[in-house]
Amino acid sequence: MFLPVILWTDALVFALLAVLLGALLRVRRSAPLRASWRRVWRNPAALSAALVLSVFLLIGLLDTLHFRPALSAASVPVTASAPGAASASAARYSSEVRSVLDVLLAPLASRSERTYSAPLATHAYARETIELPDGRQVREFPRLRHGGAHLVQLDDWAEDVMLRVLRGLVLALVLWFVLSWMLVIALRPQAEGGTQDRMHDGSRMSAAEFSAQVWRGQSEIPWRSLLITLGFLLALILPIGMLVPQYHVLGTDKVGQDVLLLSLKSLRTALVIGTLTTLVMLPFALLLGMMAGYFRGWVDDLIQYLYTSLHSIPGVLLVAAAVLVLQVQIETRPEWFPTTAQRADFRLLALCFILGITSWTGLCRLLRGETLKLREFDYVQAARAFGVGHWRIMRRHILPNLMHIVLIAVVMDFSGLVLAEAVLSYVGVGVDPSMNSFGTMINAARLEMGREPMVWWSLSSAFVFMFFLVLSANLFADAVRDAFDPRLHIGGRSA
């Protein structure tokens, strides 16, 4: 039994998914949009980046499904004087808010150590005073409570790790072969009616022949790049899955928490910052940019003065001041947030709003310049001559011709917003300290890097996860820009 919990950021993420679903349906009904997205998928790097982003998004969505677990009857006192108390106690729920990802990663969360331990280690990273059975005290590296605890002989460590990695690689190879063949079977019917599934003599191409065509790179969509990326992901994930039950793959932090768990939990924060901030930024940029470019005159002067003044203020200083003011309000009114999760979620949502309000100026300038050009086109002048209202002209004729700029800017700003959260959390004005994020991991690693011996794996883990998240977002953004920018296409072909 559990009680579903929808936090503010959860509701906005679900709303964003609904918008994406609506956009997908619109793309299916629009031939020009289908052609543009087909140009995106023809890019091998974009297809591989989309697969990596999908894995990150899946982890983030699993961490967005929150609930409160039910308390067991033994943990709730039942009084005999209250009729139906047993049934009432069965309906009580814990104050702890968990997610589906927490349930899946419960073995990692329950296997905490006392303090630091290196990746795949069997002993602690620092010496401790240990009392021997004869009463003597010595300084040595103690055995971990969970990491490598199954090993009877420490000499078997290398063999055990290699066997687990080998089993994971074999399982990855088998699973990759099955998924690849299923993908080929699923894709071949979509090619029916075209020329790519026909032999030179006109006969129908078999599944094996279509698979050979895919691996030769002769298919319209570069499925070979997708399958190779899928193979690398499986070869990385499954061996780690084999090691996780017995080892801390990425080590532990100061309080003994598994660093792999912290890194996976930090993905939701990065994705929420990158997506929800865009939802806040777009209305300001769209409305003010179109108004400035369409109406011109004093409206243009006023909007230019507004975003020029806002852009002249140092961004980090403005965000830090707003976050600190909000933090004072949160701490002085604890009754607003019954649980720690609600307080941390509200601070994350507030950070998204603050970043969105302070980062719309660049897109607004682009939309203003494009609107200044669009308002002089003949179809806009004709609409004005026939008496069509200004707002209807902007909605029907200006806005659709700005969407390629909006889409390109949104995708390209995602990586910058992810890095902005890390910087703000590093300086102490980011998300709540109780919330996992790459910024808090980097902030904690600041002192760990200066100790002796140096603890390097927390910073390295945050760097690797952020690197692949931002790299895949940038590669996908480049493909979207190349596909949707009309200046790069002349007569339906790339210039």
Indicate residue ranges for each PLM-predicted region:
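Alpha-helical transmembrane segments of integral membrane proteins
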Residues: V184, T195, L226-L236, T252-A495
